[in-house]
Curated annotation (Swiss-Prot):
Residues 1-19 form the signal peptide. Keywords: Calcium, Disulfide bond, Glycoprotein, Lectin, Phospholipase A2 inhibitor, Secreted, Signal. This is Phospholipase A2 inhibitor. SUPFAM superfamilies: C-type lectin-like. Belongs to the alpha-type phospholipase A2 inhibitor family. One of its GO terms (cellular component) is extracellular region. Homotrimer; non-covalently linked. It is found in: Secreted. Glycans are attached at N61, N122. The lineage of its organism: Eukaryota, Metazoa, Chordata, Craniata, Vertebrata.
Length: 166
């Protein structure tokens, strides 16, 4: 949308630089100004709609991160590729409310899903006896949001994490 606005400004600049020989009444200039104003209004509406959805989603799950599933069942490497192609990430809850939002998706689908735990994580939600490196190098969350060590070859629910930078 910003590209369209910039294009409109560029056309307006070119028109002004070339003079008014081809548009002595200013109709073309007025038309460009009207089109630019229309694009600005549309951009403001889209931005407002986006922010409304963002705020509603954040309010609804208590997290500014959005956890979404495509309902596929895949292993860790396939999940990584799917999330990357979708513009998201493998879930990595950093706070309790983020883990709860993630767990809500798992509970709704009655499935487990992979997550990534950073080395410097301030928040963890390991189940009793975990982490258990013997169980595998990956981590999964159960439907209650508890974390368990698991094999990276297990086929689990595909859930990707998306977050907004405002």
């Amino acid at each position: 949308m910003r590209l369209i606005l910039l294009s409109g400004l560029l056309l307006l600049g070119i028109f002004l630089a070339n003079g008014h020989e081809q548009d002595p009444d200013g109709k073309l200039l007025n038309s460009l100004i009207d089109a630019l104003m229309h694009l600005q209004r549309e951009f403001a509406k889209l931005r407002g709609a986006f922010l409304t959805v963002y705020k509603a989603r954040s309010f609804g799950n208590g997290s500014e991160r959005l956890y979404v599933t495509n309902k596929e069942i895949k292993n860790f490497e396939a999940l990584r590729q799917i999330c990357e192609q979708a513009g998201g990430h493998i879930p990595s809850p950093q706070l309790e409310n983020q883990n709860k939002a993630f767990a809500n998706v798992l509970e709704r689908h009655n499935k487990e899903a992979y997550l990534v735990v950073g080395d410097s994580a301030n928040f963890t939600n390991w189940a009793a006896g975990e982490p258990n490196k013997a169980a595998g190098a990956c981590v999964k969350a159960d439907t209650h949001g508890s974390w368990h060590s698991t094999s990276c070859d297990d086929n689990l629910l595909v859930v990707c994490e998306f977050y907004f930078i405002l």
